Amino acid sequence: MASKKAGGSTRNGRDSEAKRLGVKAYGNELIPAGSIIVRQRGTKFHAGDNVGMGKDHTLFAKIDGYVEFKTKGALNRKTVSIRPYTGSEE
């Protein structure tokens, strides 16, 4: 009669859920106020003109407008700004 002793349990087998980080709105994209532009850990991108930063470093639009990515300053920081939407564009 074939038999097998019970195997031990493993301590592995779990993983954390993906956090869906990254750029959500790209350059020259028209977005409404309050839209999330970048979800990030830390300040990979810094807030520029008309952009706010949440407590988890999420960047969001303060006004309706077009997204602009630029590098600024001696440290070449990546900044995200919103160019205002006037209504006469497009």
From Swiss-Prot:
Residues 1-21 are annotated as: Disordered. InterPro entries: Ribosomal_bL27, Ribosomal_bL27_CS. GO terms for biological process: translation. Keywords: Ribonucleoprotein, Ribosomal protein. It comes from the Bacteria. It holds the Pfam family Ribosomal_L27. One of its GO terms (molecular function) is structural constituent of ribosome. SUPFAM superfamilies: Ribosomal L27 protein-like. GO terms for cellular component: cytosolic large ribosomal subunit. Belongs to the bacterial ribosomal protein bL27 family. HAMAP family: Ribosomal_bL27. This is Large ribosomal subunit protein bL27. The lineage of its organism: Bacteria, Pseudomonadati, Pseudomonadota, Betaproteobacteria, Neisseriales. The gene is rpmA.
